[in-house]
From Swiss-Prot:
This is Vinculin. The modification N6-acetyllysine is found at residues 173, 496. Residues 1-835 are annotated as: N-terminal globular head. It comes from Rattus norvegicus. The modification Phosphotyrosine is found at residues 537, 822, 1065.
Length: 1066
């Protein structure tokens, strides 16, 4: 099947596919309509010339290359293309003498398909060789990174730096060229991100090596920390380069991303559970421990982490973990309630506490087993990939030694492990059957090579057979691992809500459990938010979570019994929809409040750590102060990460923002212990310049990452809501200050005033970012003026707070401070108002009564109605032709996933009127065309010509959507929305081009009996996946274009009318 993951492959395949589509249509006209096929000598000669040139270049490359895999894989591709060309030439010659020849028509269609498939194979083989060149450079850097472990002198360090630089430059250049060539936007982003991380870590590596060499040679303290810093940086760089190598080899969507994320999440959850277990059990053992203190919070965090693991599991494993979490949560509530009533030492309370303690052990064991199983399957999958890669090199070399056989045997052993962990017996048996076949073929090939016949035609054919069988085995094991995981919900809130809504609307449709997974994900996030809330707020949110959970379970039960369309189910669906809306609103309010509190000050703890690390050697309690500040910094960093994750999950962020937050949280978690180690080196080596520079490097890297995280979190939540939450928090801080002054508590006053100042500065940062993001001069001016006013109020308030703290009983000073506080509040309100400009009054106010003029003149008489005439009725508004989505007829054969993707786009576009909005009109047209394609692709109706023409019409509508979206982006004043719109719409042309090529491939197979079911199904699968991607990209483009149209330039000549068919308030 054709792959086109690079622009070069796509640019060569498109014109070939265009020529082939003409030949396919001619074939059909001859076969179905009985028409004479015209002389094809000229078009066939054009195809032959293009392909022959490609083959000639390929053969020249094979002669000069040292790449054994290229030498092995090129000849079969040459033969395939040349045979197909021969068939086309023969067909053209036969049709010259007999335009109605049936064998000639067969040659024509088979040759056409062979040309497309063979050209694709040829281009892919070329491309794989180019990728191997880049990988060789990457592996060279990987090997040289390990040399860092033996660098122990400054001379060695200088030499190491000089040698590493050119290699890094070469790798960066090759990666940059490669990412520009890729058509998959996600793969481009992954390569760029990993390469940028490697570049950022290079100075950190040199700094870490330098401090290690310095401490080792001077025999100073801190060598262990220096070693940790160096090894961490080497490990991190190696991991990123390995990720680059993995992404370079991807030719389609990324199947492995979830596995590494899930394994990492499980390990992190386990580590967190282990660290909290003693504290939790201590609270349970002590009947006098207060409810709500750190011990109870530890239990809540354990249940939260275990719940995350449960959500990553499937089937029985998932039910057991989540059921245990829920039960232990309820029992902990009961223990806390009994202790709050002073009954903590009662037999009932003691028994409950002991049951919770035992339950935590059981839960931990279940979580460990789940993590172990996922890690085993993931490790086996990754091991198979490496061993098969090595085996392919051995298979390409006729004189290869016995080590290749060992690699194959190792791959088969790992595949057997996956088979044994499979829940599906059919999948397990399929893998085991493949293992037996590959073992037999490999043994036969090994015998031939040991006899010195490795270069014989039989051995070469066997080697090719084993190579293909290994690739098929890898596909089967990958699928088995993927199927062992639960259905994946969207990563962002709107995506989850949409998936949930789709299931609620049609609970009987099989969506592979995605809708219910989305609801479970939302409920799980609700529980996580509730865990940090206190008292009635927590209970209220938990009650809403439970309500959604119960309604979803009841609806799923009805659907399972075949009653998903019953009146009871419809009533349940309506209740569930309302409950989800309530839950979403409360979750977003809770999350915004938490962001306002936790992100009000991100850098003070690291600055205090820096002060402690640079304290003079004779400072009192130097070590104790440092340890305390290091612990505070670590806790603070953890809180930032946890809150950012909640903002990603519950905020209004898009997928790229969510992934950006997750990446920055991961980096913060990794950097935090390294910063503490660097600070400890500085503490133990006062005055050491290398230690100071190294700490500064690590500190700045942490601060830069947290600033990036803060910006992304601000993107994820509504700015107006954040300002509202911050304003409310300042009011509460001001109330605390009043209490402090009344109770003569200067420290409490200082804490409140400091919090007010931090929150005000945070508001200034948010406002500054929004000004930088906007190109609307009026908005920028209004926000900047309000920000400047707020900025002027902060310092006077801090000065007044210091004055009143020094003499807290002075009423005059108290009044001055409160006046300063209220001025800050007033300035904050003005900033908030600048983000919500006043709407003009509607309807307009009546004119002043003074303007009315009364006269004595009578009004003229009313003219008589026309006699004998009946006014014509008002004509009905013209109906929009693209409103109705075609329903599937009884017995009609369609491709269900393709039809579903088309329906989802149509549902999105139907929210808006297409009058005066060409994007909506084109999107509806595309959805209807894709619905038609879902019929054609199964060959149930229509023709090859219809399939090819349908793909062309979809591509034409795609071009229209892209052109219009770019026009909207050009006029949008919001840089962030503009970038999002361009990123989404720029995917569309590539996908629509691929759709045309894949449709041509599929058309060559319709009605043919000499094609295997597997080959035909593979072509359909690729076409379906492409169609789903296209529909999703257009759907996202519609949403982003609507958002961008709100922020359009006032002087823009280009406008689109966005009129909702169903108003938002209904």
């Amino acid at each position: 099947m054709p792959v086109f993951h690079t622009r070069t492959i796509e640019s060569i395949l498109e014109p070939v596919a265009q020529q082939i589509s003409h030949l396919v249509i001619m074939h059909e006209e001859g076969e179905v309509d009985g028409k004479a096929i015209p002389d094809l000598t000229a078009p066939v000669a054009a195809v032959q010339a293009a392909v022959s040139n490609l083959v000639r270049v390929g053969k020249e490359t094979v002669q000069t290359t040292e790449d054994q895999i290229l030498k092995r894989d090129m000849p079969p591709a040459f033969i395939k293309v040349e045979n197909a060309c021969t068939k086309l030439v023969q067909a053209a010659q036969m049709l010259q003498s007999d335009p109605y020849s049936v064998p000639a028509r067969d040659y024509l269609i088979d040759g056409s398909r062979g040309i497309l498939s063979g050209t694709s194979d040829l281009l892919l083989t070329f491309d794989e060789a180019e990728v191997r060149k880049i990988i060789r450079v990457c592996k060279g850097i990987l090997e040289y990174l390990t040399v860092a472990e033996v660098v122990e002198t400054m001379e060695d360090l200088v030499t190491y730096t000089k040698n590493l630089g050119p290699g890094m430059t070469k790798m960066a250049k090759m990666i940059d060229e490669r990412q520009q060539e890729l058509t998959h936007q996600e793969h481009r982003v992954m390569l760029v991100n990993s390469m940028n991380t490697v570049k950022e870590l290079l100075p950190v590596l040199i700094s870490a090596m330098k401090i290690f060499v310095t401490t080792k040679n001077s025999k100073n303290q801190g060598i262990e920390e220096a070693l940790k810093n160096r090894n961490f940086t080497v490990g991190k760089m190696s991991a990123e380069i390995n990720e680059i190598i993995r992404v370079l080899q991807l030719t389609s969507w990324d199947e492995d991303a979830w596995a590494s994320k899930d394994t990492e999440a499980m390990k992190r959850a386990l580590a967190s559970i282990d660290s909290k277990l003693n504290q939790a059990k201590g609270w349970l053992r002590d009947p006098n421990a207060s409810p709500g203190d750190a011990g109870e919070q530890a239990i809540r965090q354990i249940l939260d982490e275990a719940g995350k693991v449960g959500e990553l599991c499937a089937g029985k494993e998932r039910r057991e973990i989540l059921g245990t979490c829920k039960m232990l949560g309820q029992m902990t509530d009961q223990v806390a309630d009994l202790r709050a009533r002073g009954q903590g030492a009662s037999p009932v309370a003691m028994q409950k506490a002991q049951q919770v303690s035992q339950g935590l052990d059981v839960l931990t064991a279940k979580v460990e087993n789940a993590a172990r199983k996922l890690e085993a399957m993931t490790n086996s999958k990754q091991s198979i990939a490496k061993k098969i890669d090595a085996a392919q090199n051995w298979l390409a070399d006729p004189n290869g030694g016995p080590e290749g056989e060992e690699q194959i045997r190792g791959a088969l052993a790992e595949a057997r492990k996956i088979a044994e962990l499979c829940d599906d017996p059919k999948e397990r048996d399929d893998i085991l059957r493949s293992l037996g076949e590959i073992a037999a073929l490999t043994s036969k090939l090994g015998d031939l090579r040991r006899q010195g016949k490795g270069d014989s035609p039989e051995a070469r054919a066997l080697a090719k057979q084993v190579a293909t069988a290994l690739q098929n085995l890898q596909t089967k094991t990958n699928r088995a691992v993927a199927n062992s995981r639960p259905a994946k919900a969207a990563v962002h809130l709107e995506g989850k809500i949409e998936q949930a809504q789709r299931w609620i609307d049609n609970p009987t449709v099989d969506d592979r459990g995605v809708g219910q997974a989305a609801i479970r994900g939302l409920v799980a996030e609700g529980h996580r938010l509730a865990n940090v809330m206190m008292g009635p707020y927590r209970q209220d949110l938990l009650a809403k979570c439970d309500r959604v959970d119960q309604l979803a379970a009841q609806l799923a039960d009805l659907a399972a019994r075949g009653e998903g369309e019953s009146p009871q189910a419809r009533a349940l669906a309506s209740q569930l929809q309302d409950s989800l809306k309530d839950l979403k609103t409360q979750m977003q309010e809770a999350m915004t409040q938490e962001v306002s509190d936790v992100f009000s000050d991100t850098t003070t703890p690291i600055k205090l750590l820096a002060v402690a690390a640079t304290a003079p050697p004779d400072a009192p309690n130097r070590e104790e102060v440092f340890d305390e500040r290091a612990a505070n910094f670590e806790n603070h960093s953890g809180r930032l990460g946890a809150t950012a994750e909640k903002a990603a999950a519950v905020g209004a962020a898009n997928k790229s923002t969510v992934e950006g937050i997750q990446a920055s949280v991961k980096t913060a978690r990794e950097l935090t212990p390294q910063v503490i180690s660097a600070a400890r080196i500085l503490l133990r080596n006062p005055g050491n310049q290398a230690a100071y520079e190294h700490f500064e490097t690590m500190k700045n890297q942490w601060i830069d990452n947290v600033e990036k995280m803060t910006g992304l979190v601000d993107e994820a939540i509504d700015t107006k809501s954040l300002l509202d939450a911050s304003e409310e928090a300042i009011k509460k801080d001001l109330d605390k200050c009043k209490v402090a002054m009344a109770n003569i508590q200067p420290q409490m006053l200082v804490a409140g005033a400091t919090s007010i100042a931090r929150r005000a500065n945070r508001i200034l940062l948010v406002a500054k970012r929004e000004v930088e993001n906007s190109e609307d001069p009026k908005f920028r001016e209004a926000v900047k003026a309000a920000s400047d006013e707020l900025s002027k109020t902060i310092s006077p308030m801090v000065m007044d707070a210091k004055a009143v703290a020094g003499n807290i009983s002075d009423p005059g000073l108290q009044k001055s401070f409160l006046d300063s506080g209220y001025r800050i509040l007033g300035a904050v309100a003005k900033v908030r108002e600048a983000f919500q400009p006043q709407e003009p009054d509607f309807p307009p106010p009546p004119p002043d009564l003074e303007q009315l003029r009364l006269t004595d003149e009578l009004a003229p008489p009313k003219p008589p109605l026309p006699e004998g005439e009946v006014p014509p009725p008002r004509p009905p508004p013209p109906e929009e032709k693209d409103e109705e989505f075609p329903e599937q007829k009884a017995g009609e054969v369609i491709n269900q996933p393709m039809m579903m993707a088309a329906r989802q786009l149509h549902d999105e576009a139907r929210k808006w009127s297409s009058k005066g909005n060409d994007i909506i009109a084109a999107a509806k047209r595309m959805a209807l065309l894709m619905a038609e394609m879902s019929r054609l692709v199964r060959g149930g109706s229509g023709t090859k010509r219809a399939l090819i023409q349908c793909a062309k019409d979809i591509a034409k509508a795609s071009d229209e959507v892209t052109r219009l979206a770019k026009e909207v982006a050009k006029q949008c004043t919001d840089k962030r929305i503009r970038t999002n719109l361009l990123q989404v719409c720029e995917r569309i042309p590539t996908i629509s081009t691929q759709l045309k090529i894949l449709s041509t491939v599929k058309a060559t197979m319709l009605g043919r009996t000499n094609i295997s079911d597997e080959e035909s199904e593979q072509a359909t699968e690729m076409l379906v996946h492409n169609a789903q991607n296209l529909m999703q990209s257009v759907k996202e483009t519609v949403r982003e274009a609507e958002a961008a149209s709100i922020k359009i330039r006032t002087d823009a000549g280009f406008t689109l009318r966005w009129v909702r068919k169903t108003p938002w308030y209904q």
